[in-house]
Amino acid sequence: MAVVKLSPWANYSSSKSEIKSSSSSSSSKSSLSAYVINVSSSPRLSFYNPYPRRLHHQRLSSPASIRCSVTSSDQIQAPLPAKQKPECFGVFCLTYDLKAEEETKSWKKIINVAVSGAAGMISNHLLFKLASGEVFGPDQPISLKLLGSERSFAALEGVAMELEDSLYPLLRQVSIGIDPYEIFQDAEWALLIGAKPRGPGMERADLLDINGQIFAEQGKALNAVASPNVKVMVVGNPCNTNALICLKNAPNIPPKNFHALTRLDENRAKCQLALKAGVFYDKVSNVTIWGNHSTTQVPDFLNAKIHGIPVTEVIRDRKWLEDEFTNMVQTRGGVLIKKWGRSSAASTAVSIVDAIRSLVTPTPEGDWFSTGVYTNGNPYGIAEDIVFSMPCRSKGDGDYEFVKDVIFDDYLSKKIKKSEDELLAEKKCVAHLTGEGIAVCDLPEDTMLPGEM
């Protein structure tokens, strides 16, 4: 993994005539040439010495660094060439004439975003949204730290090449690797997408254990090297219990910072309500997904609104709401697979963007959003010490608070209890991964979503 760090306000201009190589013509091809760079202002540029691609999971000591020092107001002199060939790509490896401009001077400090499963289909849609500024804003430069596996490493290189070819001004740094202790270093956001799919004949308990081990290790890595206030979004399924495992293995990170993605379910519920009412999607608000990201999830129509009016007053067919609507949301992924031949990737990426933006932008007055969060301190009577999807609001600072003004009826309470019981059973299944003793697996039924197959 190799990295070139650029000042967050610096801008590229490839005036190669101003770049003079200070390395001799006999320098090894495996060396990183040193350059003298003439600049019109005095930005700072620092290189980190690359090291070979990792082919096993083992934490390395910090790489040696190469730093440029300003010798005059118009010249930066790089030191001797590095000894190893960098594992980096295009503009993330080369040195350019850097000029400060008014636009980039106003940019925020660079943000470190780690993504696991970075060579997968969901990431293939998500990474370009992150790099474009769609997620964190047009003045937020970003460093992407991409985690893959030995098997996917060549594909991960291809992803990095595509990011290079896309010329995103806000994308200031890309690093790739297979060791979470490297990739999660100083991460301020961790989007944990990678997980093992369910194979033929695999019991749900087996998948909970296999993926649980992945998220236990990633939790330990985040605990050791990530920013102390890192925000963690768990996408890999079963995401609620994976998020619980991850947070239990990261005691230095506030449990409140962990989320399980249920935003795609919320988006699907909004879509079906809008179609039934004959309105556009943006007229639907206050939709909650309660519980587990499984077929026990509860799309809440009781508290939802259309044009600010309770859904039950707009759509007066209660039977449709309880039966057809609920079933459509719960099984939408399976229907999509039958039509498309693969699980949802693009819409999942969109929902990740929505979920992050709900945390980094203030929630509109009177509205809320769904996210799977740690239940301790919740006002709904949900059992504590699990990760459960509930309605939340945010002030736009990355934090959230529970919504208090929600109503329940017998139907909604009964459905929520079923999902709660399922998550409590899953928790017992992974007790060996959360530090709570011996695992006892007695899952009530197989409610795994089709996309987990």
Swiss-Prot record:
The record marks C88, C93 as: Activation of NADP-MDH. InterPro entries: Lactate/malate_DH_C, Lactate/malate_DH_N, Lactate_DH/Glyco_Ohase_4_C, Malate_DH_AS, Malate_DH_NADP-dep_pln, Malate_DH_type2, NAD(P)-bd_dom_sf. One of its GO terms (molecular function) is L-malate dehydrogenase (NADP+) activity. Substrate binds at R198, R204, N237, R268. It is an enzyme of class 1 (oxidoreductase). Its EC number is 1.1.1.82. Keywords: Chloroplast, Disulfide bond, NADP, Oxidoreductase, Plastid, Transit peptide. It catalyses: (S)-malate + NADP(+) = oxaloacetate + NADPH + H(+). Chloroplast NADP-MDH is activated upon illumination. In order to be enzymatically active, disulfide bridges on the protein must be reduced by thioredoxin which receives electrons from ferredoxin and the electron transport system of photosynthesis. Disulfide bonds join C88-C93, C429-C441. Residues 1-68 form a transit peptide. The active site is at H293 (proton acceptor). It is found in: Plastid, Chloroplast. GO terms for cellular component: chloroplast. It comes from the Eukaryota. SUPFAM superfamilies: LDH C-terminal domain-like, NAD(P)-binding Rossmann-fold domains. NADP(+) binds at G117, A118, A119, G120, M121, I122, S123, N211, Q218, V235, G236, N237. One of its GO terms (biological process) is malate metabolic process. Gene3D superfamilies: Lactate dehydrogenase/glycoside hydrolase, family 4, C-terminal, NAD(P)-binding Rossmann-like Domain. The chloroplastic, NADP-dependent form is essential for the photosynthesis C4 cycle, which allows plants to circumvent the problem of photorespiration. In C4 plants, NADP-MDH activity acts to convert oxaloacetate to malate in chloroplasts of mesophyll cells for transport to the bundle sheath cells. Homodimer. Belongs to the LDH/MDH superfamily. MDH type 2 family. NCBIfam families: Malate-DH_plant, MalateDH-SF1, PRK05442.1. This is Malate dehydrogenase [NADP], chloroplastic. It comes from Flaveria bidentis.
